[in-house]
Curated annotation (Swiss-Prot):
Transmembrane segments: none annotated. This is ATP synthase gamma chain. Pfam families: ATP-synt (PF00231). It comes from Jannaschia sp. (strain CCS1). The lineage of its organism: Bacteria, Pseudomonadati, Pseudomonadota, Alphaproteobacteria, Rhodobacterales. Belongs to the ATPase gamma chain family. The gene is atpG. One of its GO terms (biological process) is proton motive force-driven plasma membrane ATP synthesis. It is found in: Cell inner membrane. It comes from the Bacteria.
Length: 296
């Protein structure tokens, strides 16, 4: 049976840990509100941007003048994986789930005989992927000093990716991030950004026809799309960063809440054990006193 001093020290230690996890939970809750608002405010702009580009892509189709970012370079051999994770841990399975999704995709591509290159955003993803894919890592984006994500951060990443594409370093680019659903639900998501893919191209085209509105583009649809696509890619990356940021805070808030609850349960168990041990010591001392009195 543990002695009373050890139990008392353990209770004090767990109480101290509970204070830390509770404080982290409250900080994450405050950050989550801001991050969630930012993600929700960015969604309408991203959706409208995609709708505009989708309509243009439908009009341009596979014509000879189609932008390279839409048509691709005609190859599908080298794939760039942009994996977005957090700079810090203590957020449950937030980092591991997105890394797992990237790993599955990487293994699928390697199994098909293709080449992969990995660009990591966030320290935790780099640490995990370096164990198995060190030779495939080509770059890392450190956001540890960024207090509040801005469009400039996404534009910087987009510029790097676009430059690599222009230099024919890869053929296809996919971003991996967690899409925010709720505090307890973050969805690992993979989105191809180069060549640009629009799931609802036909639907968008039908909608524009049904509306009866005709648009004329100057100098041409191809030229407008050529100018919009880099901005669209930057917007996709920005949206992914915001979704990832909200997901991280939600995951951390949930993880710290669970840790606080577990610490409370442990304190209760240790307190019961302490009281039982103390009761046993007192009972033993009383027996010794009574035995001594009877001996006299």
């Amino acid at each position: 049976m543990p002695n009373l001093k050890d139990l008392k020290n353990r209770i004090a230690s767990v109480k101290s840990t509970r204070k830390i996890t509770k404080a982290m939970q409250m900080v994450a809750a405050a950050k989550l509100r801001r991050a969630q608002e930012a993600a929700e405010m960015a969604r309408p702009y991203a959706e409208k941007m995609e709708a505009v580009m989708s309509g243009l892509a439908s009009a341009v189709g596979n014509s000879e003048g189609a932008p390279r970012l839409l048509a691709g370079n005609g190859k599908d051999q080298v794939h760039l994986l942009v994996v977005m994770t957090a700079e810090r841990g203590l957020c449950g399975g937030f980092n591991s789930t997105i890394v797992r999704k990237a790993r599955v995709h990487a293994q699928k591509l390697l199994g098909e005989g293709k080449t992969i290159k990995i660009l990591t955003v966030g320290k935790k993803g780099r640490e995990q992927l370096r164990r198995d894919y060190a030779d495939h890592l080509i770059g890392h984006v450190d956001l540890s000093d960024v207090k509040r994500l801005g469009y400039a951060d996404a534009a910087s990443i987009a510029t790097d990716v676009l430059n690599r594409f222009e230099e024919d370093e890869f053929d296809v680019a996919t971003i991996f991030f967690n899409r925010f659903e709720s505090v307890i639900s973050q969805i690992p998501t993979a989105t191809q950004i180069i060549p640009a893919v629009f799931e609802d191209v036909e639907e968008a085209d039908d909608t524009s026809k049904d509306s009866g509105t005709l648009y004329e583009y100057e100098p041409s649809e191809e030229a407008v799309l050529e100018d919009l696509l880099p901005r669209g890619i930057a917007t996709q990356i920005f949206t992914a960063l915001l979704e990832n940021g909200a997901s991280e805070q939600g995951a951390r808030m949930s993880a710290m809440d669970n840790a606080t609850r577990n610490a409370g349960d442990m304190i209760d168990r240790l307190t019961i054990e302490y009281n039982r041990s103390r009761q046993a010591v007192i009972t033993s001392e009383l027996i010794e006193i009574i035995s001594g009195a009877e001996a006299l």
